[in-house]
């Protein structure tokens, strides 16, 4: 009996479908596995799990409780301005300066680092080693001001307790408060995010000036909200007013500023940002560098400048960029 082409096609169709489905499944599996391995490698999850399971004697052997240390302050105490720059690291500098770019995105910060004291692990502009538990903003703040990583789960009682935020920790803010300093921290976002307000209220009795405070004090309109709250251009202008007021108090002050415009993934383009680079994020970084430099120049023109120490640090590395150099 003769068979037409249609009969042959009908008989072969199921096998072709199985072959096609098998290939699609295999490709899908490779894509999923590849994406998973990329994420594990790029976000250093393997290292995180390894470090969490490993027990060391670091604190037993090296940690010094600041409560037990006698600190001697000079009779004329120096003021402190500490600027936390969101996601800023030396990878944005030119390779010639120790960075990862052909051309520096932040030449002003490069110049400030070279003209002043720069803590580095080599002869160029280096960086600190970012440990587990210091890789996001509040964790970095705890790490820099208390000397410990923030390894407590977000849902733990000690993390969310509004009246008992790590009561056993003794921080820089508490040391300064004990020695007569006025502490203030300013940010253009909501300080309740990440329990930042809990940390600073309970460790140094900081006056917290954030987005909510700016609305309450009439510095911005009630319906004003860009990016995370208000932009860094306003932050530096508000900081000038508050620092001027603090300087007239007759007491030493510690002012901490927390920028936000360079937050990932693309940052916030304010009216002062230029469009020099193809990448929006690169343009925002360049804008931040100019803003910080302008603020420093303003500080230099103030009568209190000679008795003030200004510290500029990145809060943490940019997690979306994988660079083999861990100290950046």
Question: What is the predicted role of each segment?
Answer:
Residues 13-29:
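Membrane-interfacial entry segments at the cytosolic side of transmembrane helices
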Residues 115, 244-250, 297-307, 328:
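Secondary-structure transition/capping motifs at alpha-helix termini
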Residues 1-12, 325-327:
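Short, small-residue-biased leader/transition segments that mark boundaries at the very start
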Residues 1, 62-66, 293-296:
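Short, motif-level signal for alpha-helix interfacial/capping segments enriched in acidic residues
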Residues 201, 258-265, 311-320:
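Acidic helix/loop microenvironments that form the catalytic cleft of cell-wall polysaccharide enzymes
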Residues 28-78, 82, 89-253, 260-276, ...:
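Active-site-proximal alpha/beta segments of enzymes that process anionic O-linked groups
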Residues 291-324:
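Metal-dependent active-site segment of extracytoplasmic phospho-/sulfohydrolases and closely related
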């Amino acid at each position: 009996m003769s068979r037409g082409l249609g009969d042959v096609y009908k008989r072969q169709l199921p096998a072709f479908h199985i072959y096609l489905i098998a290939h699609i499944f295999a490709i899908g599996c490779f894509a999923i596995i590849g994406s998973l391995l990329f994420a594990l490698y790029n976000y250093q999850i393997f290292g995180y799990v390894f470090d969490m399971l490993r027990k060391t004697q670091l604190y037993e052997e090296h940690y010094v409780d600041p409560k037990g240390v006698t600190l001697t302050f000079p009779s004329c105490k120096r003021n402190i301005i500490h600027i936390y720059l969101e996601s800023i690291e030396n990878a944005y500098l030119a390779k010639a300066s120790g960075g990862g770019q052909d051309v520096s995105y932040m030449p002003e910060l490069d110049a400030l680092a070279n003209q002043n004291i720069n803590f580095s692990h080599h002869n160029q502009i280096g960086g600190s080693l970012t440990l587990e538990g210091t890789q996001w903003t509040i964790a970095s703040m705890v790490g820099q001001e208390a000397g410990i990583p923030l390894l407590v789960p977000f849902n733990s009682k000690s993390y969310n307790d509004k009246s008992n935020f790590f009561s056993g920790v003794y921080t820089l803010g508490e040391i300064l408060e004990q020695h007569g300093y006025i502490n203030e921290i300013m940010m253009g976002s909501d300080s309740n995010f990440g329990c930042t307000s809990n940390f600073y209220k309970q460790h140094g009795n900081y006056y917290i000036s954030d987005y909510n405070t700016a609305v309450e004090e009439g510095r911005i309109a009630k319906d004003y909200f860009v990016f995370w709250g208000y932009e860094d251009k306003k932050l530096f202008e508000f900081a000038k007013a508050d620092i001027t007021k603090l300087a007239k108090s007759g007491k030493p002050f510690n002012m901490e500023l927390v920028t936000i415009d360079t937050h990932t993934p693309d940052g916030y383009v304010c009216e002062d940002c230029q469009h020099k680079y193809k990448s929006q994020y690169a343009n925002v970084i360049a804008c931040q560098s100019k803003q910080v430099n302008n603020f420093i120049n303003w500080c230099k023109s103030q009568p209190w400048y000679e008795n003030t120490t200004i510290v500029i640090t990145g809060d943490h590395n940019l997690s979306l960029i994988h660079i083999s150099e861990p100290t950046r």
